[in-house]
């Protein structure tokens, strides 16, 4: 696999994930601080790649598609895996996630990866036992968080959403409401800010 060196100019922040990212972008477009999540456009470029229904393998394929178009991220935010719960054995899912994160790091040795943990759902569509899936979600999050931190990545916990208040969700019990999405975007912004602090010694603020 080729390594792609960073080009000059703005720090490129990419957000890749399933419908949560798709809906988060749509919400950010109509609510302050906007699609840039409050970061200065002159120094940071925030790019959203949300694909509804995306399962974990889509992270790698989406990344490759964008890279082949001549672009590359400096900071990569990933929110995916939730649509695989109940369909892929936990061990297999964790292995696939770790392997892909390693591939990404080989492609971009200087990248900062931000792992956005899977948030709870009131309804798990592919599960006979929702509580069992919730326990598995917690285990996967814990394992991936530890893995990402080993290579100085950033973990976004979404602690407020762990309260699972009905008002945080859309009527389907899967997707987040406007309130829930605002909280989701706030946490993503905080995670990106931490990643920027590790990038170029925080020179983006200068």
Language-model features, listed with the residues they occupy:
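Serine-esterase "nucleophile elbow" of acetyl-processing enzymes
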Residues: 1-52, 65-68
């Amino acid at each position: 696999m080729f390594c792609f060196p960073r080009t000059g100019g703005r720090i490129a922040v990419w957000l890749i994930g399933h419908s949560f990212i798709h809906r988060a972008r749509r919400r950010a477009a109509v609510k302050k601080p906007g699609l840039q999540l409050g970061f200065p456009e002159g120094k940071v470029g925030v790019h959203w790649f949300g694909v509804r229904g995306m399962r974990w393998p889509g992270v790698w394929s989406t990344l490759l598609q964008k890279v082949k178009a001549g672009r590359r991220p400096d900071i990569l935010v990933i929110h995916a895996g939730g649509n695989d719960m109940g369909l892929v054995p936990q061990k297999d899912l964790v292995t696939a996630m770790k392997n892909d994160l390693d591939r990404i790091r080989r492609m971009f040795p200087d990248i900062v990866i931000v792992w956005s943990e899977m948030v709870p759902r009131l309804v798990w569509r592919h599960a006979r036992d929702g509580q069992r899936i919730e326990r598995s979600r917690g285990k996967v999050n814990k394992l991936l968080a530890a893995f990402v931190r080993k290579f100085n990545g950033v973990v976004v916990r979404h602690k407020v959403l762990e309260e699972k208040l009905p008002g945080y969700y859309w009527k389907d019990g899967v997707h987040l409401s406007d309130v829930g999405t605002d909280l989701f975007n706030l946490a993503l912004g905080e995670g990106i800010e931490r990643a920027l602090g590790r990038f170029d010694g925080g020179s983006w603020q200068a």
